[in-house]
A protein has these predicted regions:
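Electropositive, gly/pro-rich neighborhoods at or near active sites that engage anionic ligands
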Residues: 1-82, 96
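Residues at the starts of beta-strands that form the adenosine-phosphate
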Residues: 83-84, 112-116, 226
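Structural motif
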Residues: 84-86, 200-201
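Gly/Ser/Thr-rich loops at beta-strand to alpha-helix junctions
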Residues: 88-100, 121-125, 207-212
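Histidine-anchored nucleotide/phosphate-binding helix
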Residues: 93-112, 116
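C-terminal functional extensions of proteins
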Residues: 119-121, 128-257
Length: 257
């Protein structure tokens, strides 16, 4: 990402490529990575080694580059700077790696920005839990002390529980950890140096959180909040409902303004 000419675009592409790896859409995964020594049936999948996983991820990223984008608001996203960001993670593995890189990029883009990486409290299919996210992030820190480790230590990135245990996301029933963080940041530090209201971004990752349960939530947020729905369409049901094709990508930025 750091060596890319467009680091935000690279972070978004990696996030979308990672979102393919979903136990709830295993057939879609197999269709993309069939060239690897991939094993399993249509209900489960596994990789024999790290080389297989790397091959599969590159195949997925190529698919992102070559696929149609049902919504492409990347330019609008790039034109904004966000002071506070909540990233609601989806799947464990490659997907949460993509979300971590996106959180890192968003924390770097705006001076004084803070980002919350949010995960389920309890397990649901292969969705990452807060305990798994913390373990994963600790490994990432070892490889990136300049940013990920420093950002965790100085509070630019926080790891928080959503208080939920579902593949969907009910934004009216989030837990104490994320609620307290948002309340604190939006009141104590809720204005910038010029006294203007801080600008917030809510990132909803994956089919369950962004396509199935919160597709229109941008209409209902406060005026200083934007919502980014970010996902790869991996099922015929969702494709038909949205007027899309399987493997189409969604990068939809919305608000109530």
């Amino acid at each position: 990402v750091d060596n890319s000419e467009d680091s935000l675009k690279s972070a978004i592409e990696i996030a979308l490529a990672g979102n393919l790896f979903d136990a709830g859409a295993a057939q879609a995964v197999q269709n993309v990575v069939g060239g690897s020594s991939f094993k399993g049936d249509s209900n489960k999948f596994a990789f024999k080694n790290s080389e297989d996983l790397q091959f599969a991820f590159e195949a997925s990223r190529k698919r992102v580059r070559n696929s149609e984008w049902l919504c492409d608001d990347l330019d609008e996203l790039r034109a904004n700077e966000y002071d506070r960001v909540c990233v609601f993670c989806d799947n464990a593995g490659a997907d949460v790696l993509g979300m971590t890189l996106l959180a890192r990029e968003l924390a770097k883009r705006t001076k004084g920005a803070k980002v919350a990486l949010v995960a389920n409290e309890l397990a649901a299919l292969n969705d990452v839990t807060i305990n798994e996210l913390e373990e994963f992030y600790q490994v990432c820190e070892q490889h990136d002390p300049e940013y990920l480790q420093l950002y965790r230590e100085n509070g630019k990135i926080a790891l928080l529980s959503s208080g939920q245990a579902s593949t969907l996301l009910n934004l009216n029933a989030t837990g104490k950890d994320i609620n307290d963080w948002v309340k604190r940041e939006d009141t104590v530090g809720g204005v910038d140096m010029e006294g203007k209201k801080l600008k917030w971004l809510v990132v909803l990752d994956g089919m369950g959180r962004s396509l199935e349960s919160n597709w229109e939530c941008g209409k209902y947020v406060q005026p200083h909040v934007d919502v980014l729905n970010l996902a790869m369409v991996k099922s015929e049901i969702n494709a038909k409902r949205l007027g899309a094709n399987v493997y189409d990508c969604v990068c939809k930025l919305s608000n109530s303004r």
